[in-house]
From Swiss-Prot:
Task of the protein: One of the multiple factors required for polyadenylation and 3'-end cleavage of mammalian pre-mRNAs. May be responsible for the interaction of CSTF with other factors to form a stable complex on the pre-mRNA.
Record PANTHER family: CLEAVAGE STIMULATION FACTOR SUBUNIT 1
Main location: nucleus
Annotated WD repeat ranges: 106-145, 171-210, 215-254, 260-301, 303-343, 395-431
Assembly and oligomerization: Homodimer. The CSTF complex is composed of CSTF1 (50 kDa subunit), CSTF2 (64 kDa subunit) and CSTF3 (77 kDa subunit). Interacts (via repeats WD) directly with CSTF3. Interacts (via repeat WD6) with BARD1. Interacts with ERCC6.
Keyword Nucleus: yes
Domain remark in the UniProt entry: N-terminus mediates homodimerization.
Protein name (database record): Cleavage stimulation factor subunit 1
Species whose genome carries this gene: Rattus norvegicus
Localisation: Nucleus
Phylogenetic placement of the source organism: Eukaryota, Metazoa, Chordata, Craniata, Vertebrata
Database matches in InterPro entries: CstF1-like, CSTF1_dimer, CSTF1_dimer_sf, WD40/YVTN_repeat-like_dom_sf, WD40_repeat_CS, WD40_repeat_dom_sf, WD40_rpt
Entries under Gene3D superfamilies matching the protein: Cleavage stimulation factor subunit 1, dimerisation domain, YVTN repeat-like/Quinoprotein amine dehydrogenase
A GO CC term attached to the entry: nucleoplasm
Keywords for the protein's UniProt record, in alphabetical order: mRNA processing, Nucleus, Repeat, WD repeat
Length: 431
């Protein structure tokens, strides 16, 4: 049978695939030995691509492997991370250091929470002053691009029509601790230290107060809407997770007390298809739950070596969980095996982390972003290889308590104890 000539580049590609497979399977020391021997030109990410290619070759003839290597559908299109196939995907999206501040809004107290709407058009921020602001991303970009002389000559009416803050909501009597946009309706949910969950209808310009609320027994720490919008997960200072029907306010909890955390819940998030949700807690555990039965499927004990879990979110394809902890480390977990595939280290080198913050994906899941508490800068890693990228100085005058990235565009919001929220964006050359 005719065989194509194998060149040096082919062998280098083979060695990279072997290293990636060893890393994926957990043979770190063997992989490092091979890396030291081969010295590949680029960083190898954990990947199962070699196994898939071998299976294709065994199922078909020996030309199938060569065919699969060049096949477009074996490479992720850049819309999300998938380590089974995309070890060699070239990242096209901008890294964090290329973003710039486009707009700054101020509260009258520390700003510690923000959230994006599903379409990326709106951002809500919450503060210790008990207020909530809703901002329009397009207006923020337009405002930042507007010449000073044009801005100075705006009438009061024009300024109001073009102002990025489209709503300011007041109905809590203590710090706003968590926010979530309804997936389909113009409704914003908020949780607070005043023990209430409130629902605001922001479709009405005159609306300042909530139209519904739920009285909780503890301070709320994290909320997440079911993708249908009919239910909302609530994590509080109490270790028992709640699920509410937002129409009837009926509360559901797992029928097995052993499913619950043993300390306050810091993070709750649904996956896109709603068949799972994930929680992180001060008890150091990450729990994966069945979205239908409300039962705990699995628990990752001491997920961050016993440190408090600050955040846990799903990747777009629901194959992975990205978590962060007070050990200043971000981790990528494979759900099917419960293993840590990638660790993102280097934040928090100047001192122990005191406050909670979040690790987030950028909109293409090419990068992981995590604020460094002491230096007030943003750490950035390649999501597949954990290669450190350039730091971004965040320009705040106090600790950054929250970061949220747009689900659709190269933009993110940072919230700080300096009372400010900064909107960052990477403009293209055509903007």
């Amino acid at each position: 049978m005719y065989r194509t000539k194998v060149g040096l580049k082919d062998r280098q590609q083979l060695y990279k695939l072997i290293i990636s497979q060893l890393l994926y399977d957990g043979y770190i020391s063997i992989a490092n030995g091979l890396i030291n021997e081969i010295k590949p030109q680029s960083v190898c990410a954990p990947s199962e691509q070699l196994l898939h290619l071998i299976k294709l070759g065994m199922e078909n003839d020996d030309t199938a492997v060569q065919y699969a290597i060049g096949r477009s559908d074996t490479v992720a299109p850049g819309t999300g991370i998938d380590l089974e196939f995309d070890a060699d995907v070239q990242t096209m999206s901008p890294e964090a250091s290329e973003y710039e501040t486009c707009y700054v809004t101020s509260h009258k107290g520390p700003c510690r929470v923000a959230t994006y709407s599903r379409d990326g058009q709106l951002i809500a921020t919450g503060s210790a002053d008990a207020s909530i602001k809703i901002l329009d991303t397009e207006r923020m970009l337009a405002k930042s691009a507007m010449p000073i002389e044009v801005m100075m000559n705006e009438t009061a009416q024009q300024n109001m029509e073009n102002h990025p803050v489209i709503r300011t909501l007041y109905d809590h009597v203590d710090e706003v601790t968590c926010l979530a946009f309804h997936p389909t309706e113009q409704i914003l949910a908020s949780g607070s230290r005043d023990y209430t969950l409130k629902l605001f209808d922001y479709s009405k310009p005159s609306a300042k107060r909530a139209f519904k609320y739920i009285q909780e027994a503890e301070m709320l720490r994290s909320i997440s809407f079911h993708p249908s919008g009919d239910f909302i997960l609530v994590g509080t200072q109490h270790p028992t997770l709640r699920l509410y029907d937002i129409n009837t306010f009926q509360c559901f909890v797992s029928c097995n007390p052993q499913d619950q955390h043993t300390d306050a819940i810091c993070s709750v998030n649904y996956n896109p298809s709603a068949n799972m949700y994930v929680t992180g807690s001060k008890d150091g555990c990450i729990k994966l739950w069945d979205g239908v039965s409300n039962r705990c499927i699995t628990t990752f004990e001491k997920a961050h070596d016993g440190a408090e879990v600050c955040s846990a979110i799903f990747s777009k394809n629901s194959k992975y969980i990205l978590s962060s902890g007070k050990d200043s480390v971000a981790k990528l977990w494979e759900i099917s095996t419960g293993r840590t595939l990638v660790r993102y280290t280097g934040a928090g080198l100047s001192g122990r982390q005191v406050h909670r913050t979040q690790a987030v994906f950028n909109h293409t899941e090419d990068y992981i972003l995590l604020p460094d508490e002491r230096t007030i800068s943003l750490c950035c890693w390649d999501s597949r290889t954990a290669e450190r990228r350039n730091l971004l100085s965040l320009g705040h005058n106090n600790i950054v308590r929250c970061i949220v990235h747009s689900p659709t565009n190269p933009g993110f919001m940072t919230c700080s104890d300096d009372f400010r929220a900064r909107f960052w964006y990477r403009r293209s050359t055509t903007d």
